[in-house]
């Protein structure tokens, strides 16, 4: 089923190739320090065990920021979705010079954020906040790309790509 092009295999030219999917791209920018998903906490009150999520207000703020950027009326996305998340973390003071150079970034200051919070917990927060706001369920996400970087302005940038055949 693959066509040969001067002795080489051309993988992009299958005889009964499906039409290329159409793609819709939606971008969100949420200002503020990215929030990682935290584990629920348990407590004992008498003989009853209870749980609480210490993070509900932070998730609510993120969900509201995302919802405000959607057009009205909005229909929840369906189908295969690719999500690209870029988490920009605040730089610590140790990345900057001292004295008159206190606003100058050191030459050896790293670009990528390699400490906590973990990137998977940052993703979980974004996915949970997009459930029933942007898409119906995060099970429709077929590909996810994420990165953590340092920045002077902490924020979360989310790109959602929806693929539809036809």
Regions found by a protein language model. Give the residues of each.
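Acidic, proline/glycine-enriched N-terminal capping motif
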Residues: 1-166
């Amino acid at each position: 089923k693959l066509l040969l092009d001067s002795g080489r295999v051309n993988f992009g030219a299958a005889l009964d190739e499906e039409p290329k999917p159409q793609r819709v791209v939606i971008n969100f920018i949420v200002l503020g320090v990215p929030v990682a998903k935290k584990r629920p906490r348990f407590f004992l009150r008498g003989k009853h065990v209870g749980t609480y999520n210490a993070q509900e207000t932070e998730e609510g703020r993120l969900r509201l920021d995302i919802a405000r950027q959607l057009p009205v009326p909005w229909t929840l996305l369906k189908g295969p979705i690719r999500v690209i998340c870029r988490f920009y973390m605040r730089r610590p003071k140790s990345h900057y010079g001292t004295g008159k150079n206190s606003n100058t970034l050191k030459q050896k200051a790293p670009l990528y954020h390699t400490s906590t919070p973990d990137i998977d917990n940052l993703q979980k927060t974004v996915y949970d906040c997009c459930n029933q706001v942007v898409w119906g369920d995060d099970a429709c996400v077929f590909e996810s790309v994420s990165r953590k970087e340092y920045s002077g302005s902490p924020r979360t940038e989310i790109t959602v790509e929806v693929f539809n055949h036809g």
